[in-house]
């Protein structure tokens, strides 16, 4: 049962990315990352102009929301323009195939994250359908690799993470 859900999540991600194309997917992801950075770094500057809001928390939250949404809108416009250029150059077939590959990787990462949280915060790993899954062990490898990379590159994680 869980294997069908895993396949469904990955297939859906592939289909969405196939339809949207690699350029749109990457620019969309980049827009979200940039929006997060812009909102988290520049909200104090906008909050200083929102003096009509008395609560500092609401003022800061409003500034964050405004910056985040505006950055996403600018990202969507840039995404649209660049996507139109890709379509005009005749690279849409290649763009869609690369998009499907992007969707496969994204789907696998989404499934790995879901399985990690289910394993860590629930008792699903003790159920029969979890134990009988043919696919879950493969995602265990991805999760382990991810935490090894984090451990190797982060000063916050000590080498005793896996011990």
Swiss-Prot record:
It comes from the Bacteria. The keyword Ribonucleoprotein does not apply. GO terms for cellular component: plasma membrane. The keyword Cell membrane applies. Signal peptide: none annotated. It is a multi-pass membrane protein. GO terms for biological process: toxin biosynthetic process. To E.coli CvpA. InterPro entries: Colicin-V_CvpA, CvpA-like. The chain crosses the membrane at residues 2-22, 26-46, 62-82, 97-117. This is Colicin V production protein homolog. Keywords: Cell membrane, Membrane, Transmembrane, Transmembrane helix. It is found in: Cell membrane.
């Amino acid at each position: 049962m869980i294997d069908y859900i895993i396949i469904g999540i990955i297939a859906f991600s592939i289909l969405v990315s196939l339809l949207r194309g690699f350029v749109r997917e990457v620019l969309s992801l980049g827009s979200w990352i940039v929006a997060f950075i812009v909102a988290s770094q520049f909200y104090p500057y906008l909050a200083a102009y929102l003096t009509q809001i008395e609560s500092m928390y609401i003022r800061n939250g409003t500034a964050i929301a405004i910056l985040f949404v505006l950055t996403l809108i600018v990202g969507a416009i840039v995404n649209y323009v660049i996507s139109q250029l890709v379509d005009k150059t005749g690279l849409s077939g290649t763009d869609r195939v690369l998009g499907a590959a992007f969707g496969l990787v994204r789907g696998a990462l989404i499934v790995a994250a879901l399985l990690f949280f289910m394993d860590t915060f629930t008792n699903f790993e003790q159920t029969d359908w979890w134990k009988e899954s043919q696919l879950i062990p493969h995602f265990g490898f991805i999760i382990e690799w991810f935490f090894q990379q984090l451990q190797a590159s982060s000063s916050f994680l000590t080498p005793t993470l896996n011990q």
